[in-house]
Each structure stands twice: as C-alpha cells, then as structure tokens.
Amino acid sequence: SDVYLTLNFDLQRAAEEGLKKSKTGRGAAVALDPRTGAVLALASAPAYDPNIFVGYSDEDNPKQSKKINEYNLAVQGIYPPASTFKIITAAAALEDGHLDVKRKINCPGHYNSGPRVFKCWSTHGPVDFFDGVSNSCDVYFYVVASETGAAAIERVERKFMFGRQTGIDLPGEKAGNLY
C-alpha cells in the first residue's frame, strides 16, 4: 500500500522547536487538517533518535538503551481532554436542546457538585456561551454538562471519535479513555 506524507515542514519544525524550548523538555504536539484528518505536524519530546544505537549492542552498552525514550507521547500518551472537551459538551447540549447561547451563567470561580468543589481558572462573573468559550470558563461548562447529562455527552463524544484509535498507523498508538 502507498504512504503519503502530509507533514508541513514549517509546522513540524515549529512543533519540534517549541518542545525543545519547553521548561520540562517533555510533551507532544499534533496539528491536523480538520477537513481531511491529514497530519500536518506530529512531535514528541524527548525525541527518539535511532542513530544513537548505531555501532552498539545492549551487551556493549546496556545503560545506553535504558536512557533512550522509546515512548512517542503524541500517539502513545493518554491525557485528560481538558478545555478541548468544552466544545463536545456544547455540541451535546445543542443537540439535546439544553443550550441557550444567550443565557448567562454566573462563574464565581468554583462549581460545587455534592461534596466536591471544582475550581475555574478565574472568576468570570456572568457569562454566555460565547464568553464561556472565549474565556475558557470551566464553571460555565460544568453547569452546561450537568444540565445536559452524561448519556447525551457520551453519545456526542463517540460521534467525535473519542475513545478510538485514529488509524494513523504508527506503532503503539493508544485509544483514548472515556472514563
């Protein structure tokens, strides 16, 4: 079968350089074309350099192979979706008729759910949908998610392919975890 490379050189370089300059030296960056799913950039740090093995065997240098990061964070890491999931929550609420984009929800900087308190990154005061998205207001989306319900959100997240492998055909790709 044929393999077509869709990487954008400038985006790929920017992703790799950005990861090199990060304080932790660890992370992943992926840029996709939303229309086609083509991978425009895919980087993981620390990077894996197979050239380090040239001329060595494990018997020659057993410590060397343990130092190499053979884990591609971009395709093998499993992460909480964080703010990217707010749009999924909004889509589920719109689909089920639970979202009035003009309705204002007050953000006091936290959301109480039973005995648990979830914090927002700021105190936004009254926000509508557009403010909730542009300010990434956690409280707004906690309220919308609570009103929409887990079943509706799960239906939409599956439509958006959450919990599945992408099919990128790279070794070790992991499916997301919905729970």
For every predicted segment, state its role.
Residues L7, D33-S83, I88-Y179:
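Beta-lactam-recognizing serine transpeptidase/beta-lactamase-like catalytic domain environment
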Residues S1-G27:
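Conserved, well-ordered alpha-helix/loop/beta-strand core segments that scaffold catalytic motifs
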Residues A29-A31:
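Short beta-strand scaffold segments in enzyme catalytic cores
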